Amino acid sequence: MAAKSQPNIPKAKSLDGVTNDRTASQGQWGRAWEVDWFSLASVIFLLLFAPFIVYYFIMACDQYSCALTGPVVDIVTGHARLSDIWAKTPPITRKAAQLYTLWVTFQVLLYTSLPDFCHKFLPGYVGGIQEGAVTPAGVVNKYQINGLQAWLLTHLLWFANAHLLSWFSPTIIFDNWIPLLWCANILGYAVSTFAMVKGYFFPTSARDCKFTGNFFYNYMMGIEFNPRIGKWFDFKLFFNGRPGIVAWTLINLSFAAKQRELHSHVTNAMVLVNVLQAIYVIDFFWNETWYLKTIDICHDHFGWYLGWGDCVWLPYLYTLQGLYLVYHPVQLSTPHAVGVLLLGLVGYYIFRVANHQKDLFRRTDGRCLIWGRKPKVIECSYTSADGQRHHSKLLVSGFWGVARHFNYVGDLMGSLAYCLACGGGHLLPYFYIIYMAILLTHRCLRDEHRCASKYGRDWERYTAAVPYRLLPGIF
């Protein structure tokens, strides 16, 4: 359910000649073949409670001014019943259904029908037709990278409407926020169910499918590795980036417009949240080609975790800071605002530079300079399913010599900055940093398990050279 996926441990060479042998791929690619009781319990818990968590947070803002304990206190003390809270919840509306259908259709058209032109005039930007990483079955998919273009065109239309056309109010997203939640849930469940049926009956690449024999695990974690319709519509790339992440900045802009409508001004806290989160969104689309080598594309299958998560969890819970500031227009002191800005920018610097170091190392096969020096590497090897031996390199210089996942530290610093922009009045806006800390720690451990299975003793040499996973001296 993450908006910003993270790269695997930096490697200089891709995986060639790989087949979908169960023994070789179980620890290296994709999700598990078999399900232990803890994983199954976790899956069932998320399927049951994740939709409720989203509803609870949004309802708490709508009915209790973002006080998370408000609904519980009212129910326990008898001041309200669950039926009372539900009765006050706005239902799905025709307007919301029309808006959401138009939105998703527009993003599908931008994704499938408009080849990228940004790479033709933006120096350093890599777009157009690009290859992804090799799959467990040895397939190398091609992708139409045009996310930055879609983001730019979408926001150009948004600002044209706000300042010239006046087709709709900039507050339209906030004004229909809960009715749109039901629409997003319908799409999330529909695409997840379709992906599961497709995996059973007409998969894009049957050799990349995984079945556990457990319905709930298959539904949540997915069966197909890269489900597609036609040549270019890739479920993973579309739903991870569009409609959720393109919408992220639009949602924040709508929240800012609502704050101005209600309070006659936009606070510096709202400006900070909009600017800092926009930096990460633009970075995501500027580096969309790099994203093809991240854990979401290279490891995760497409199921409810990605389908529903990207439609509902991401746009509704990653934007809680902006929503909170509509109800609580926090105006930060100058030192507080400067501190939040610096924390966010330093976090982004670490996040971007660490990923750039890894990408540069991979593209040049280690023939580069990192922090002005020739990079130190751990030479390693692994055997693929066809018995072929491959050689690779693990980077131990730059930020990757500080900790094995130091890019996550930058991500966490940025996440904390969003939350601190909201002051200390309520817990709700701090959900994001709590969630990201859990998510990135889990990803860190999952990636390390996969790399240990792949590289064996060479991985032990690497962990000896870089002893800390995330925080030097701590973890």
Swiss-Prot record:
Family annotation (Pfam families): ERG4_ERG24
Membrane topology classification: Multi-pass membrane protein
Keywords, sorted A to Z: Cholesterol biosynthesis, Cholesterol metabolism, Disease variant, Endoplasmic reticulum, Hydrolase, Lipid biosynthesis, Lipid metabolism, Membrane, NADP, Oxidoreductase, Phosphoprotein, Steroid biosynthesis, Steroid metabolism, Sterol biosynthesis, Sterol metabolism, Transmembrane, Transmembrane helix
Outcome of swapping residue 93 to M: In SLOS; loss of 7-dehydrocholesterol reductase activity
A GO term for molecular function: cholesterol-5,6-oxide hydrolase activity
Enzyme Commission number(s) from the entry: 1.3.1.21, 3.3.2.11
Domain of life: Eukaryota
Name assigned to this protein: 7-dehydrocholesterol reductase
Catalytic activity: cholesterol + NADP(+) = 7-dehydrocholesterol + NADPH + H(+); 7-dehydrodesmosterol + NADPH + H(+) = desmosterol + NADP(+); 5,6alpha-epoxy-5alpha-cholestan-3beta-ol + H2O = 5alpha-cholestane-3beta,5,6beta-triol; 5,6beta-epoxy-5beta-cholestan-3beta-ol + H2O = 5alpha-cholestane-3beta,5,6beta-triol
Stretches that traverse the bilayer: 40-60, 154-174, 177-197, 266-286, 306-326, 331-351, 420-440
GO cellular component, as recorded: endoplasmic reticulum; endoplasmic reticulum membrane; membrane; nuclear outer membrane
List of residues that carry Phosphoserine: 14
Reported tissue expression: Widely expressed. Most abundant in adrenal gland, liver, testis, and brain.
Chain positions covered by the region annotation Disordered: 1-21
Function: Oxidoreductase that catalyzes the last step of the cholesterol synthesis pathway, which transforms cholesta-5,7-dien-3beta-ol (7-dehydrocholesterol,7-DHC) into cholesterol by reducing the C7-C8 double bond of its sterol core. Can also metabolize cholesta-5,7,24-trien-3beta-ol (7-dehydrodemosterol, 7-DHD) to desmosterol, which is then metabolized by the Delta(24)-sterol reductase (DHCR24) to cholesterol. Component of the microsomal antiestrogen binding site (AEBS), a multiproteic complex at the ER membrane that consists of an association between cholestenol Delta-isomerase/EBP and DHCR7. This complex is responsible for cholesterol-5,6-epoxide hydrolase (ChEH) activity, which consists in the hydration of cholesterol-5,6-epoxides (5,6-EC) into cholestane-3beta,5alpha,6beta-triol (CT). The precise role of each component of this complex has not been described yet.
Annotated pathway: Steroid biosynthesis; cholesterol biosynthesis
PANTHER family: 7-DEHYDROCHOLESTEROL REDUCTASE (PTHR21257:SF38), DELTA(14)-STEROL REDUCTASE (PTHR21257)
Positions bound to NADP(+): 358, 362, 395, 400, 407-408, 447, 451-455, 462
Effect recorded for residue 317 to V: No effect on 7-dehydrocholesterol reductase activity
Consequence of changing residue 306 to R: Loss of 7-dehydrocholesterol reductase activity
Family of the protein in this entry: Belongs to the ERG4/ERG24 family.
Documented activity regulation: 7-DHC reductase and cholesterol-5,6-epoxide hydrolase (ChEH) activities are inhibited by tamoxifen and the selective AEBS ligand (4-benzyl-phenoxy)-ethyl-N-pyrrolidine (PBPE). ChEH activity is inhibited by oleic acid.
Effect in UniProt of substituting residue 274 to K: Loss of 7-dehydrocholesterol reductase activity
Record-level GO BP terms: cholesterol biosynthetic process; cholesterol biosynthetic process via desmosterol; cholesterol biosynthetic process via lathosterol; positive regulation of ferroptosis
